[in-house]
Regions:
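A short, glycine/small-residue-rich beta-strand->loop->alpha-helix junction that serves as a flexible
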Residues: 5-17, 236-240
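Donor-nucleotide binding loops and adjacent catalytic segments primarily
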Residues: 20-22, 212-294
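Conserved nucleotide-sugar donor-binding subdomain of glycosyltransferases
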Residues: 66-108, 152-154, 158-162, 168-169
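A donor-sugar binding/catalytic signature common to diverse glycosyltransferases
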Residues: 101-105, 284-327
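A nucleotide-sugar donor-handling region in carbohydrate enzymes
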Residues: 147-236, 265-267
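C-terminal alpha-helical cap of glycosyltransferases
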Residues: 347-348, 359-375
Length: 375
């Protein structure tokens, strides 16, 4: 099985590790990951065979706001074309040995695999419209359609919205190509709750399994007080959120007996301080999410899912003008402007008790079984 993991951030890698671990429990099939950067490092550290081939463009983020989104979109299109060449070389060399292509939001590999007759392709995709409760709520406004036999319907899947005005015409063309690829996939795995239709399969949140009790983790991590976890993902885009979180924490620390752990990620280097714990990059972030009393993060999907499944209260501030993060945050009632209310939000959240984890969340296992059935 070839597993193409988007290297933009670390969320794709973390959930793909969870899926791969479950696949190994079901079938004895070789898994080869293709990714890049910090995502490659994380996957390799978990013991999986991986190729470090992708080099994604970086966002330009200033004060928590995405700048020049159209420039980034153009860089992404160039990156996509490069990835298609890389994916084509990998797939053509290995298609006889790996007839299944799994892609976590890497459309380049999906595009290549759909031109290879012997290959089956599975897409993991989480851009679901935040205001829709069922798959049909937005049917009248979305143009994505899937066909299964003679049955046709409109999928409740979102589109990219980085640009506006006449520039959006280029983005609309990209979205049409993306919809075409989605429609042709053998399966589209959506890590959310919803009604399965045609090639869409809603599996629920996909998170890594926590194998220790929460109290044991807290003891091992040395957590004795209420603990805030601040994490910024796999890029330096969270610098502004970290700074604002530390400002709010230092004010609250004068009134509350509370600690703060900072996980800044692999690309953001910050000075140490005596009033918080700076861990830098950790490969077991999910365990820290479970052990903490509050998570403050950008609105990346994987951290949100981990917070939800593990029962840890969270504050999720999106990058301004990053449509996907803004959608994720909207579902939880947050927006970028809430960054100015962090002190009050933290105080409110710390009053909440840690909830029981959702032990029946089986997104990784369900996805692994879908993959194994196509092997």
């Amino acid at each position: 099985m070839l597993f193409f993991t988007s290297p933009i951030g670390l969320g794709h890698a973390t959930r793909d590790i969870a899926i791969a671990e479950k696949v190994k429990q079901i079938v004895n099939d070789e898994i080869l990951f293709i990714s890049g950067g910090a995502a490659y490092d994380l996957i390799s550290k978990e013991g999986f065979q991986a190729l470090n081939l992708y080099r994604p463009p970086s966002f330009t983020v200033d004060s928590g706001k995405l700048r020049n989104p159209f420039v980034w979109l153009m860089k992404y299109i160039i990156y996509y074309k490069r990835c298609k060449k890389i994916a084509e070389e990998v797939i053509r060399k290995a298609s006889h040995k790996h007839p299944i292509i799994v892609s976590d939001e890497d459309f380049a590999s999906i595009a290549v695999s759909q031109n290879i007759i012997l290959s089956k392709n599975i897409l993991i995709y989480d851009m679901v419209d935040p205001t829709a409760n069922t798959i049909n709520d937005k049917a009248s406004r979305l143009a994505i359609t899937s066909t299964y036999g003679n049955f046709k319907f409109e999928n409740n899947i979102g589109e990219t919205h980085f640009t506006s005005g006449f520039l959006h015409e280029i983005e609309k063309k990209m979205n049409r190509s993306m919809r075409h690829l989605i429609n042709k996939c053998d399966k589209v795995i959506i890590p959310d709750y919803g009604d399965n239709k045609a090639n869409l399969v809603y599996v629920g949140p996909i998170v890594r399994e926590v194998k220790s009790e929460r109290n044991s983790l807290r003891y091992n991590f040395g957590l004795t007080r209420k603990t805030i976890l601040v994490c910024a993902g796999g890029t330096d885009a969270g610098r502004h959120l970290i700074q604002k979180s530390l400002e709010a924490y230092r004010k609250l620390k004068k009134r509350f007996d509370v600690d703060l752990i900072l996980v800044s990620g692999p690309n953001l280097k910050l000075d140490d301080s005596n009033d918080f714990y700076n861990l830098g990059f950790v490969d077991n972030l999910h365990e820290y999410v479970y052990a903490s009393d509050l998570v403050i993060s950008l609105a990346g999907r994987s951290t949100i899912d981990e917070s939800t499944v593990y029962g840890t209260p969270g504050i999720f501030i999106p990058i301004k003008n990053h449509f996907e993060q803004e959608q994720n945050a909207l579902r939880l009632g947050y927006k970028y402007e809430d960054i100015s209310k962090l002190e009050r939000l933290i105080e409110e959240k710390l009053e909440l008790s840690h909830q029981n984890p959702i032990l029946n969340s089986r997104g990784a296992e369900v996805t692994a079984r879908i993959i194994s059935e196509l092997l």
